[in-house]
């Protein structure tokens, strides 16, 4: 079976080879999900359910059902605030775009498409491109677009650097190529970003009162929390990205070959040590502590995943 190359996996490969090795070659992952990832996934789930036809009320109810009981490892107040944040962001998003004129051609489109050598047209015998497109929509002018949802913890205003970076974002290019390979003649990407709130729970304030205050703030400053714009992809940009994909696949194959000759395969994958990389890495304590990973006996707090792409397996089970 060919290994899957997703946008998230390729980003990990570019960010730190050791992190990529542990996460995608060994399948190591934290047992407990970090708050930003958990909130983003639940928010995304609510949008998906609504796009698939569920009412706003049921979409919010379903997206927040995992917050019904606070786990032992979290603070009950923090847990309740997170739930209120999720409810308010979903309600605000539904309100903000209730008058949009998007026709959904597909919702949560999971894909596996060939990785092709751009110079020869040969198909990779080792890897396939995989992922999940949030949606394919028809715009009011009749064009097809890939719809991509994101949550962000930074400025998303019209002049923010956030939008400048998207001009070179590989995930967008991958999704355009995948959608076209699956028969959707997409012309652009509609990028929908929701900013996470910066207001915090006040002293003596209940989580419910915080949620009401957040929803009021969203109503008064919708553009602060929600932005949506087109991100085009030109044909020459897609051609360059195809070359980048093939180059990264060759790099990964070279790493695998070298690892096969070493007593500690992790040594073939050098570390990218720095504040920006280590500060956001789930393996930082293990890596900086010089811990050697045995996948048959993972460190406390970690597990070895049976599938390194659980987000894709989840979709396949629902299909």
What residue ranges belong to the model's regions?
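RecB-family 4Fe-4S metal-dependent nuclease core
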Residues: 1-319
């Amino acid at each position: 079976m060919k290994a899957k190359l997703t946008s998230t996996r390729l980003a990990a490969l570019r960010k730190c080879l050791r992190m990529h090795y542990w996460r995608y070659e060994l399948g190591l992952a934290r047992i407990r999900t970090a708050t930003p990832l958990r909130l983003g996934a639940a928010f995304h789930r609510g949008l998906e359910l609504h796009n698939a036809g569920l009412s706003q009320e049921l979409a919010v109810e379903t997206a927040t059902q995992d917050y019904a009981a606070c786990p032992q490892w979290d603070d009950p107040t923090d847990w309740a605030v997170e739930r209120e944040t999720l409810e308010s962001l979903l309600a605000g998003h539904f309100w903000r775009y209730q008058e949009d004129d998007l026709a959904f051609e597909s919702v949560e489109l999971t894909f596996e498409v060939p990785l092709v050598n751009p110079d020869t047209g040969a198909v990779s015998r080792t890897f396939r491109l995989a992922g999940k497109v949030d949606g394919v929509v028809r715009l009011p002018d009749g064009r097809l677009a890939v719809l991509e949802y994101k949550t962000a913890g930074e400025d998303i205003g019209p002049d923010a650097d956030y939008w400048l970076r998207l001009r070179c974002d590989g995930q967008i290019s991958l999704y355009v190529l995948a959608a076209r390979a699956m028969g959707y003649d997409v012309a652009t990407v509609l990028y929908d970003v929701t900013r996470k709130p910066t207001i915090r729970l006040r002293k003596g304030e209940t989580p419910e009162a915080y949620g009401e205050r957040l929803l009021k703030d969203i109503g008064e400053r919708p553009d602060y929390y929600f932005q949506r714009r087109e991100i085009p992809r030109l044909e020459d940009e897609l051609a360059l990205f195809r070359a980048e994909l093939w180059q990264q696949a060759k790099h990964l194959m070279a790493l695998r070959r070298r690892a096969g000759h070493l007593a500690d395969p992790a040594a073939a994958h050098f570390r990218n040590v720095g504040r920006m990389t280590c500060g956001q890495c789930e393996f930082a304590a293990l890596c900086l502590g010089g811990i050697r990973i045995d996948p048959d006996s993972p460190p406390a707090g970690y597990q070895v995943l049976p599938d390194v792409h659980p987000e894709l397996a989840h979709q396949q089970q629902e299909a």
